[in-house]
Curated annotation (Swiss-Prot):
Residues 2-246 form the ABC transporter domain. Its main location: membrane. The complex is composed of two ATP-binding proteins (PhnC), two transmembrane proteins (PhnE) and a solute-binding protein (PhnD). The gene is phnC2. Its EC number is 7.3.2.2. Keywords: ATP-binding, Cell membrane, Membrane, Nucleotide-binding, Phosphonate transport, Plasmid, Translocase, Transport. This is Phosphonates import ATP-binding protein PhnC 2. InterPro entries: AAA+_ATPase, ABC_transporter-like_ATP-bd, ABC_transporter-like_CS, ABC_transpr_PhnC, MetN_ABC_transporter-like, P-loop_NTPase. It comes from the Archaea.
Amino acid sequence: MLRVESLRKVYDSGDVALDDVSLTVSGSETVAIIGPSGAGKSTLVRCINRLVEPTSGTVWLDEREVTGLPEKQLPAVRRDMGMIFQEYNLIERLTVMENVLSGRLGYVSSWKGFRRKFPQEDVDRAFEILDRVGLSGLENNRADELSGGQRQRVGIARAVIQQPKIMLVDEPTSSLDPDTSRDVMDLLTEIASDEGVPVLLNIHEVDLAVEYADRIVGLADGRIVYDGSTDGLDEGIENKIYRNGRESARSSPSSEPALSDDTELHR
C-alpha cells in the first residue's frame, strides 16, 4: 500500500506546488490524479519516488518510509515503484530489449548492469512481456526508431519487468493521438489488473480518467479538492477543480510546466 501524509513541496522560487496532500492507494485499484496545468500533478508523482524532494510530509510504501531514506537506499525502494514517464524516458541509442531489461538493474550488480549481463530468466521474461505489449519482433530495434505509442509500450514493459508494488504513471497519453491513447490506457490497466498492482496515474484528459480509473483525485493549486469515485465527479466538482478557468476540464490536453525527466537509469 502507498500512503502519502501531509506532503508539501515549495520550490526555491517560493511557489507552492503541493500543500498538505494526503492519500492512499492500495489493492489493485487505479487512481487518477486530475487538475489544471500547474496543479501539482507531476510534482506529486515525482515526490513519491523522490525524483523531486518534498519539503515536508511523508511517503510510505507498505511499512517503509520513502521520504526518510538516505540517497544510497533509494534504488531498493525505486525498484518497487514502476515509473512510466510522459516523455518515455528511454535510452534512444539502445535497443527495445536493452531498455526493457533496464527495469531489472535493481536486481543485478553494478558491473553486470553496466555490461548489460542479465540472467536468462530475465531475458525470457522480457520476451514474454514484449509479446504481451504488442512489440514482439521489435526487440532489436533502437528506441529512436519507434513511434510514440511503441515507445510508451516499451516504458510499460520496463515497468512491469521490475515486478513493482505500485505503478506511478506521469501523463502517459499527452504526446499521443486519441486512438493510440486509448490503446495505451487499455494495455496499462489490463496489465496492472492481471499483475494485481495498484496504479497512481497523473492524467490530463478527464474523459480518460473517468473511463479507466476506479477513483479520482482532483488537485487545484497543490491541494486535494476531491477524492472519490468516478461516479461522484459531477460538473460542480469539476468546476471546483478547474475553478481558475485556465482550461476546460474536458478540453484537449496541454502540458504542465516542464519538469525535466531524469534520464539516468535508477537502480
